[in-house]
Swiss-Prot record:
Its cofactor is Mg(2+). It comes from Geobacillus sp. (strain WCH70). Pfam families: MMR_HSR1 (PF01926). GO terms for biological process: division septum assembly. GO terms for cellular component: cytosol. Mg(2+) binds at S37, T59. This is Probable GTP-binding protein EngB. Belongs to the TRAFAC class TrmE-Era-EngA-EngB-Septin-like GTPase superfamily. EngB GTPase family.
Length: 193
């Protein structure tokens, strides 16, 4: 896909702040600091539309990025970040659940995991949650540039087996550094547009 226009449209914490209209949305989920913002920036050929941070837990709102005036990427707060209070975690959970279970514009969730490590318990819980609600999911195994090419298949197998990925969901090897998997990711997303 050729992205000619991309802008942050809305930062929201509750449904009444979500953008109006019926444009399709793709939510980006994953643990804190896994590379959701880097994924957005690579996909749209921008250096820093989505702010990246080395500090986990930076994204605290649902950030809606309007792409080509035809759909949104929705960056959701990362999970599994230890240094937030129980109260904040509960508020986060409620915000996420509300969005994922009630938003009609949501077409699919892009679940981003780190190829270097087996998916965490939080990754597994997130994937099971998405499957429970029958939300189509595209799994992006990112940071492929940090794993030797000869070990990619072995690492992908661990991701596939740990998450117990169903046949309909696509698993894509990705690198925000090299652009590996970008075309495949666009092809997977375009199926839902």
């Amino acid at each position: 896909m050729n992205v000619t226009k991309a802008e942050i449209a809305v930062s929201a914490v509750k449904p009444e702040q979500y953008p109006d209209g019926a444009l399709p949305e793709f939510a980006l989920a994953g643990r804190s600091n896994v590379g959701k913002s880097s994924f957005i920036n690579k996909m749209i050929n921008r250096k820093n539309l989505a702010r990246t941070s080395s500090k986990p837990g930076k994204t605290q709102t649902l950030n809606f990025y309007l792409i080509n005036e035809s759909f949104y990427f929705v960056d959701v707060p990362g999970y599994g970040f230890a240094r937030v209070s129980k109260k904040e975690r509960e508020a986060w959970g409620k915000m996420m659940e509300t969005y994922f279970t009630t938003r009609e514009q949501l077409r699919a969730v892009v679940l981003i995991v780190d190829l270097r490590h087996p998916p965490t318990k939080d990754d597994v819980m997130m994937y099971e949650f998405l499957k429970h609600y029958q939300i189509p999911t595209i799994i992006i195994a990112t940071k492929a540039d940090k794993v030797p090419k000869g070990k990619w298949q072995k690492h992908l197998k661990v991701v596939r087996e740990t998450l117990n990925i169903i046949e309909d969901d696509k698993l894509i090897l990705f690198s925000a550094e090299t652009g590996q998997g970008k075309e495949e990711a666009w092809a997977a997303l375009e199926r839902f547009l």
